[in-house]
Amino acid sequence: MSARRNFEWPELLTADGRGIAFGGDYNPDQWSEDIWDDDIRLMKQAGVNTVALAIFSWDRIQPTEDRWDFGWLDRIIDKLGNAGIVVDLASATATAPLWLYESHPEVLPRDKYGHPVNAGSRQSWSPTSPVFKEYALTLCRKLAERYGTNPYVTAWHMGNEYGWNNREDYSDNALEAFRAWCRRKYGTIDALNQAWGTTFWGQEMNGFDEVLIPRFMGADSMVNPGQKLDFERFGNDMLLDFYKAERDAIAEICPDKPFTTNFMVSTDQCCMDYAAWAKEVNFVSNDHYFHEGESHLDELACSDALMDSLALGKPWYVMEHSTSAVQWKPLNTRKRKGETVRDSLAHVAMGADAINFFQWRASAFGAEAFHSAMVPHAGEDTKLFRQVCELGASLHTLADAGVQGTELAHSDTAILFSAESEWATRSQTLPSMKLNHWHDVRDWYRAFLDAGSRADIVPLAYDWSSYKTVVLPTVLILSAADTQRLADFAAAGGRVVVGYATGLIDEHFHTWLGGYPGAGDGLLRSMLGVRGEEFNILGAEAEGEPGEIRLSSADDSAALDGTTTRLWQNDVNVTGEHAQVLATYAGEEADEWELDGTAAVTRNPYGSGEAYFVGCDLDVADLTKLVRAYLAASSQENADVLHTVRASADATFDFYLPRGKKTVELQGIEGEPVILFQTDREEKPGSYTVRRNGVLVVRR
């Protein structure tokens, strides 16, 4: 396992190189050069100090195979630098020029049906194509040779959103690479046959040259889940290897500037194993796009909580988010008054030290013409650009106050996230195809906020032993080693909360035997003090069947009375001598499924700690009741406010952001205000009125 790269933050063109980075993707090659000076004038007006440049510019840099044109890039980098704006220079490989596809159509990826993924969009290339890699690395070296010592280029932006369009490649190149990957991973074909369970449906292989990728096999056919899980791992690894090849090609020439690439962690996107990717960058970056509705801020904070963990508590970079509406959803909602500033400051509240947008100037043409930007189609005399300017001033104020470099204070609760469990929940072979690990992580996160607490989101593979409580929502895959870690954590005094559909399979997608949840050859069952025989899956597939089952509290708290489950119920027996049943299934619907009186939520002492089993799905409101009663009963936080703390040895900053539509009255706030965005300071010391989408930041 490779060591993590050193943390290195790109410098700005300030006297000390410090400050909160602010800007966006800049695509000057979409515009005539007579626009560039006006762009820079507006950038200075808005307080922009950094741009990401040349992300989709390969065809402008290399118009034909034997011709290179750096002149336009030289000119814009000089203009930006002379204006005090640094460049995060892209490797420009996100989209290849059409001449390359015409000359070498074999570089195109293929879908599971064998069709080529044609050029014309982004990432229409196979990460396993040696031909494409040769051209891409030549480009990287050319860029490094020309700009490696340029003082205005302070960071390298590798690729763009790796995996957006080529996460799964079914080409012949991919097939050969997958066979080699399997050989490296398993060593022998017998070990691979064992891992994939190929005796089922007669899939045994005699050699690695018989290994297949999970191409289309017929409309009603199901892919071997072990094979598909390894193909997901392979796709992640191939893209990571491609990123590292690009990075290393530049680093050989320009080793002294930091490298990053933009992850995709937001509403419905967490497609890569970013716990592995985070080790290979000098600073972590993310593209975050907002979730419409009442959970807008909560989802942002949840995604950012994972980013903070991936960054190991170091500052991280918002590489892209939107000033207002995007253009790629069926319905694209704009942001309300204040949300452009509020969302950006919320990212800072969650540990970000850089706020960039897609993009600087709204495109006049192309697929993203109606995607919002810092400068909208209507120009500078707009509400949106004025908000951008207000944001720039706020970020400058925060930087002057000393926020940059402070670290986000952690919770005592960790919600564990597993990319492999996220991939596994997509399998067609599970009792329900409605499982979604990342959504369940988000629901638990919101429940802690609603209970007046806050949790961290931590990759399962990381060290979470310092927390008091760990929560596992739909963590389908648990290895024996990870199960032992959980048992050791509980035995040492920790609290483990295991959600439904957790610990059902091992890392090869083999079911753990002996009863559910069986992870660790029954160690998880022993820790929980329960043993499940079957799952009850609701879905109203048969007319007249109940769509939900009610729970009834089984202890004096009555906390879970009236809560309901609508998808998945574990039918378990309580086996622990000292296990306590906290809630049971109850009522006519439970009786219909022979679950009436069966344990739904339990608690079991284990060593010096305890383990909870939440054996059914619950919505956010019902999870909140559970969290408030058993997991965060002592919390004193105001559930109407997202409150975070960033601190260093020199200063502590408190951020307060209302979570809903209502104005929030805050009292007893210590410290001096730094930011009063849509916030009024009242006469009474420590009292503030924070309006909808407002932000209060105080230093103490």
UniProtKB/Swiss-Prot annotation:
GO terms for biological process: carbohydrate metabolic process. Involved in the hydrolysis of transgalactooligosaccharides (TOS). Highly active towards Gal(beta1-4)Gal and Gal(beta1-4)-Gal-containing oligosaccharides. Low activity towards Gal(beta1-3)Gal, lactose and Gal(beta1-3)GalOMe. No activity towards Gal(beta1-6)Gal, Gal(beta1-4)Man, Gal(alpha1-4)Gal, Gal(alpha1-3)Gal(beta1-4)Gal, lactulose, 3'fucosyllactose, lacto-N-fucopentaose I, lacto-N-fucopentaose II, cellobiose, maltose or sucrose. Optimum is pH 6.0 using PNPG or TOS as substrate. Not active below pH 5. Inhibited by high substrate concentrations (100 mg/ml). No effect on activity with various EDTA concentrations (0-1 mM). 20-fold higher activity when cells grown on TOS than when cells grown on galactose, glucose and lactose. Signal peptide: none annotated. The lineage of its organism: Bacteria, Bacillati, Actinomycetota, Actinomycetes, Bifidobacteriales. This is Beta-galactosidase BgaB. InterPro entries: Beta_galactosidase_Trimer (IPR013738), Class_I_gatase-like (IPR029062), Glyco_hydro_42 (IPR003476), Glyco_hydro_42_N (IPR013529), Glycoside_hydrolase_SF (IPR017853). GO terms for cellular component: beta-galactosidase complex. The active site is at residues 161, 320. One of its GO terms (molecular function) is beta-galactosidase activity. Keywords: Glycosidase, Hydrolase. Substrate binds at residues 122, 160, 328, 368-371. Trimer. Tetramer. It is an enzyme of class 3 (hydrolase). It catalyses: Hydrolysis of terminal non-reducing beta-D-galactose residues in beta-D-galactosides. Belongs to the glycosyl hydrolase 42 family. Optimum temperature is 50 degrees Celsius using PNPG as substrate. Optimum temperature is 35 degrees Celsius using TOS as substrate. Stable at 40 degrees Celsius. Half-life time at 50 degrees Celsius is 10 minutes. Its EC number is 3.2.1.23. The N-terminus is blocked. Gene3D superfamilies: 3.40.50.880, Glycosidases. SUPFAM superfamilies: (Trans)glycosidases, Class I glutamine amidotransferase-like. It comes from the Bacteria.
